[in-house]
Amino acid sequence: GADESLLDTYQAERSPHVRRIVESAVGFGRIICTLDVDEAAGRDQTMIAAREANPVDIGGAPMPSLSGSNLVTDGAGYVVGDSRIEGRILDELLDGRWAVIGREDSLTDDDRRVLSGLDAVVIDDDGDIVIVRPDRIVFGTGRTALEALADVANRYSLAG
């Protein structure tokens, strides 16, 4: 199994993430739950005007990324989006495992050894390499992420 020090990364990684989510929820709560009638009317007018000025649906609230551990690389740490690859739902392809999405022919023999040791799934797709953790968090992208994954697999004895 994995080295027990892997568990030490959990608090460092999740605490800032949860803090940002709670702060965001409190901020939205202040906007939504005002008891002042005049303040609520002003808020409503501002939001209606903003929606009319820019009617494009921007989706849900942004989700903060994970940070604070070596289990994500710079610019990563977000939950991978729901999508389809070759007509299949990405969750079905990920199957709760490490995954590499991208051009399979860009992987080196060393990459393949690391991925095999992790029992990672390789999803051949056009575009840059994206590495997804078993918890659906983007570990990183590109060649540097593949190298970082090899380091993490070694450091925490993740390879079988």
Residue ranges of predicted features:
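Helical substrate-recognition/capping region of FAD-dependent monooxygenase/halogenase enzymes
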Residues: 2-160
